[in-house]
C-alpha cells in the first residue's frame, strides 16, 4: 500500500481521479479542510475555483472511508521548528501533519503530493526527493 498525503492545491487539481488508484490510500490534514471551506466562500476567489472546492468537499464526503484525516495539533509544527526555521503558515501546518503521518502512522510509506514549489522544497528536508510527488495539469 502507498499512502499519499495531499496538500490543498494538489487536491483541487486531482480530485476527479483521487480515489481511482489501486493500492493507494489518500491522507489529508484538517488544515486542508479549513482551506477548502474558506475557498468555497471567499469573495476573492473566482467562480471556477470555488466550484472546484465545493465539488472536492462532496467527493471527500462521498468517500469518507477511503481517506485518512489527520487533525493538526501545534505540537506537530513544533517538531519541524526543532530542526529548521519556518514561518507558521498553513502550508507548514499541512507539512507538519504529513511528517507526523509519515513518522507515526505509516513510517516511510508516505508520499507527499504537492504542486507548490516552495512547499516541495521545504518537504524535501523531511521526506527526501523520492517521497515527494508533484501534481501537474494535463
Regions found by a protein language model. Give the residues of each.
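Active-site-proximal, substrate-binding regions of enzyme catalytic domains
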Residues: 1-111, 115-138
Amino acid at each position: 500500500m502507498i499512502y499519499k498525503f495531499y496538500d490543498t492545491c494538489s487536491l483541487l487539481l486531482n480530485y476527479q481521479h483521487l480515489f481511482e488508484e489501486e493500492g493507494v490510500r489518500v491522507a489529508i490534514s484538517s488544515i486542508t479542510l479549513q482551506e477548502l471551506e474558506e475557498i468555497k466562500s471567499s469573495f476573492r476567489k473566482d467562480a471556477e475555483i470555488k466550484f472546484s472546492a465545493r465539488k472536492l468537499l462532496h467527493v471527500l464526503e462521498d468517500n469518507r472511508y477511503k481517506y485518512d484525516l489527520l487533525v493538526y495539533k501545534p505540537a506537530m509544527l513544533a517538531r519541524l521548528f526543532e530542526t529548521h526555521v519556518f514561518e507558521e503558515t498553513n502550508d507548514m501546518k499541512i507539512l507538519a501533519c504529513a511528517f507526523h503521518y509519515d513518522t507515526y502512522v505509516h513510517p516511510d510509506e508516505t508520499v507527499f503530493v504537492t504542486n507548490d514549489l516552495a512547499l516541495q522544497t521545504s518537504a524535501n528536508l523531511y521526506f527526501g526527493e523520492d517521497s515527494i510527488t508533484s501534481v501537474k495539469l494535463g
